[in-house]
């Protein structure tokens, strides 16, 4: 029995919440984990998989988590030091969330081939005890049994992923169980990845029914109207991926995906073209570009070369390429460079990128004054490729700079702005600008400081010299502590 297909529920290190319930009594509940039907990716084969308790499993009752089971097997007892109410109790098996709030992570882990960690990967079960505190657990999540094998590939497997072509389907995320099923997902994703660590695991030379090689947890969802992508990633950078028809995933059911991983038929990887791939792509600090891709078969030794300090995430499993500069300027980063992707030394993709950085020596600012009674000022920027970027201050800071923009000065990684009327028009109407004096980061245009300070001139009058409100017009900064305003 123990050498059979053991989909054992293994726990994470979720600690019992001390003192969550007061005024209760000591209770011990005994549970049996019910078996589920195993199906292949095609037809149901009718075999059953016993789900076994692990020694460190716990359950939830009335918002309180039990002590660990202590023993592994088909039955286990769970103790509560303080539990309110009387049996029957509603029981939840949930090692990644709390009570009825289930959490299936998009990134799951398995330490070794055949050593399943379903509990730590989001396995969820429920039951109602009888009057004596006994219960049989029903499983509400679904399970993907990965059954890969190869007689050609020696590289070690570091991860396997399942993704739906329809990206609106949530295989993972956070959902609340209502007794009959799960509610809508928050933080959901259309893919799950099961990782085996940096060293990976060896592939078996053949598939088989006597042992589950690897298994991931997903929510029961209907994938029958879409395709699914199964992707195996290896330690040397090689990838094997295949597309299959989807199907409806039922609660408590296990779906077997058998894959012969072979190099014979080769493979293909194609990244979606941009609007003008012969032109460099401009990205903003904190922004990103995401391209779709198609992939199938054996793709050997994929390598990505990205600009310094940039992120280039080629995720073949999720069929995406995400490129992003850092959120802030970092010393030594490349402002312009080329992203290259190759397979087995052969080029697959090349694209020039640059980050919109306002310190570039070939950039040009145009200050738009606005109107003193109706419109705040704005800034237009022409970058080194003569591309026009309008309202750059507003886009970064979610507000306008001020009324009647007069002047700017750049020094020491800062930009200093002066506006004539600040937050109001010349007639006193509020226009909600940031102020008369504004300082921004010169690389990103992010606002550092805004003040609506008034400026006064000493003006002679019939009653003598007195300070009179005036309009600032020009600014020169000479250091972080000193500047001149006309």
What residues fall within each predicted segment?
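Short glycine/acidic-enriched loop and turn motifs that connect beta-strands
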Residues: 370-375, 421-431
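A short loop-to-beta-strand structural motif that recurs across blades of beta-propeller domains
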Residues: 378-380, 435-438
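Short loop/turn segments that connect beta-strands within beta-propeller blades
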Residues: 383-386, 441-445
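Beta-propeller fold detector
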Residues: 388-397, 447-455
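Sec-type signal peptide cleavage vicinity
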Residues: 10-266, 326-347, 354-388, 400-410, ...
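Repeated scaffold domains used in trafficking and secretory/extracellular systems
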Residues: 399-410, 456-478
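Sec-dependent bacterial lipoprotein signal peptides
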Residues: 1-8
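Surface-exposed binding patches on compact interaction domains or structured appendages
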Residues: 267-268, 277-320
């Amino acid at each position: 029995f123990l050498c059979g297909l053991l989909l054992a529920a293994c726990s994470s290190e979720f600690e019992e919440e001390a003192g969550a319930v007061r005024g209760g009594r000591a209770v011990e509940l005994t549970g049996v984990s019910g078996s589920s039907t195993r199906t292949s990716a095609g037809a149901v084969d009718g075999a059953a998989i016993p789900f076994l308790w692990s020694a460190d499993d716990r359950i939830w009752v009335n918002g309180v988590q039990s002590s660990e089971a202590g023993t592994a097997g088909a039955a286990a007892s769970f103790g509560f030091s303080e539990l309110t109410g009387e049996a029957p109790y509603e029981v939840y098996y949930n090692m990644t969330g709390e009570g009825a709030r289930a959490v299936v992570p998009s990134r799951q882990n398995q330490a070794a081939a055949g050593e399943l960690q379903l509990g730590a990967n989001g396995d969820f079960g429920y039951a109602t005890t009888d009057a004596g505190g006994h219960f049989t657990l029903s499983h509400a999540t679904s399970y993907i049994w990965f059954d890969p094998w190869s007689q050609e590939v020696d590289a070690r497997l570091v991860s396997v992923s399942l993704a739906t072509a329809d990206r609106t389907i949530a295989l993972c995320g956070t959902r609340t169980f209502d007794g009959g099923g799960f509610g809508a997902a928050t933080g959901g994703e259309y893919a799950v990845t099961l990782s085996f660590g940096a060293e990976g695991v060896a592939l078996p030379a053949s598939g088989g029914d006597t042992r589950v090689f690897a298994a991931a947890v997903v929510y029961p969802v209907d994938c029958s109207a879409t395709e699914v992508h199964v992707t195996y990633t290896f330690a040397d950078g090689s990838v094997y991926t295949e597309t299959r028809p989807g199907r409806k995933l039922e609660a408590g059911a296990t779906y077997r995906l058998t894959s012969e991983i072979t190099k014979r038929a080769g493979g293909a990887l194609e990244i979606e073209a941009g609007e003008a791939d012969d032109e460099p792509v401009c990205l903003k600090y904190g922004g990103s570009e995401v391209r779709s891709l198609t992939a199938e078969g054996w793709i050997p030794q994929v390598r990505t070369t990205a600009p310094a300090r940039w992120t280039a995430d080629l995720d073949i499993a999720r069929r995406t390429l995400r490129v992003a500069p850092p959120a802030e300027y970092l010393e030594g980063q490349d402002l312009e460079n080329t992203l290259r992707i190759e397979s087995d030394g052969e080029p697959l993709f090349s694209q020039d990128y640059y980050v919109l950085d306002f310190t570039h020596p070939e950039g040009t600012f145009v200050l738009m004054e606005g109107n003193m009674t109706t419109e705040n000022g704005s800034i237009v920027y022409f970058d080194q490729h003569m591309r026009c970027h309008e309202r750059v201050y507003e886009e970064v800071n979610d507000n306008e700079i001020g009324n009647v923009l007069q002047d700017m000065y750049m020094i020491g990684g800062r930009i200093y702005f002066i506006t004539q009327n600040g937050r109001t028009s010349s007639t006193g109407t509020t226009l909600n600008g940031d102020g008369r004096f504004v300082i921004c980061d010169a690389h990103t245009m992010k606002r550092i400081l805004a003040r609506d300070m008034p400026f006064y001139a000493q003006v002679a009058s019939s009653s003598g010299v007195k300070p009179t409100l005036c309009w600032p017009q020009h600014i020169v900064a000479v250091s972080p502590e000193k500047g001149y305003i006309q």
